[in-house]
Amino acid sequence: MGDLRVACIGAGYFAQFHYQAWAQISGVDLIASVDMDMSKARATGLAAYDNTEVMLRDAAPDIVDIITPPQTHFDLIKLALQSDVRAIICQKPFCRDLDEARRAADLARSAGVPLIIHENFRFQPWYRAIKQVLDEGGIGAVQQVTFRLRPGDGQGATAYLDRQPYFQKMKRFLVHETAVHWIDTFRYLLGDPASVFADLRRLNPVIAGEDAGYILFAWPDERRALFDGNRHLDHGAKNTRCTMGEALIEGTGGTLTLAGDGSVALRKFGAAAGTVIHGAEDWQGFGGDCVKALQTHVIAGLIDGAPFENMAHEYLHVLEIEEAVYRSAASKSWEPVSGTV
């Protein structure tokens, strides 16, 4: 089998991490870039297009990597499914809303083409290390998890303009764009929650959506997880965007602490100090090279038949939880997660 041919749709800010990662993965031939701004597509050094349909016809990729805003996803997925692709990867937030995401997932399932959502935080090396400890029972029975989001990029009239200016116009922001990462990560670590409670705030008046809030997740066995997010505030790290914050995973037998440099320490119950079980590294890519880790995972699935994480139909559970969060913020009460997807 020859190298798998990959084409990327989108060449905006975050797309750079996708292109860089694909270029480092063996068994991959990165062949084309599509963007409405042809100059951005050309800047990648690949065959450049401003028309996805033409690219699919001329380049004939095996994998299409969609790195565009949510309102474009459904039409691009539909176009890709009409060509002879072996897999589609789609960035999050996935589609405009849950209904559109369901329709996209159904189309891919009917076509027999894997549609994998590029939700990469669960692939960050510190969460993989934490998951291994939990699976091995290293901190006993987990009772609670806390993540404090503190990227420090949300203050003032110029917030987000240097990287992703469309953030300012999103009517649903903190949860839909950012906290959704931890909705999926909490699912990865603890399974699907049964209900949620949310208190959301908009602190920066120049943006349309919420930029701070608390989200409490509950499981039937009395486990709890707390997402405590505030994009105005920072945390003690040289790069506040490495982990985006700090976490505690607490169990009856010990506590795991995630620091802002990506290191994870384990303190056994009753001990005064902990031991670093996952050290910080000088990761070159975003978030501990999680983009590359996800892409490598997809390649392994296509070549070796390894099961895919983040298949679109499974990821719909994340969107259902997100909807419950917004319902809770509006009702100011606990909201059940329906589990109907």
Residue map of PLM features:
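Conserved SAM-binding strand-loop segment of SAM-dependent methyltransferases
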Residues: 46-52
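Core-facing hydrophobic residues within beta-strands of well-ordered domains
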Residues: 28-30, 85, 142, 193
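C-terminal helix-rich "cap/oligomerization" subdomain common to oxidoreductases
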Residues: 1-3, 63-66, 220, 297-341
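Predominantly a Rossmann-like dinucleotide-binding segment in NAD(P)-dependent oxidoreductases
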Residues: 121-207, 332
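Contiguous beta-strand/loop segments that form the cofactor/metal-binding neighborhood of enzyme cores
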Residues: 183-263, 292-304
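Active-site loop of classical SDR/Rossmann-like NAD(P)-dependent oxidoreductases
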Residues: 36, 283-296
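Beta-strand-loop-alpha-helix segment that lines the small-molecule cofactor/substrate pocket
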Residues: 58, 62-69, 74-122, 137
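N-terminal Rossmann-like dinucleotide-binding module
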Residues: 1-44
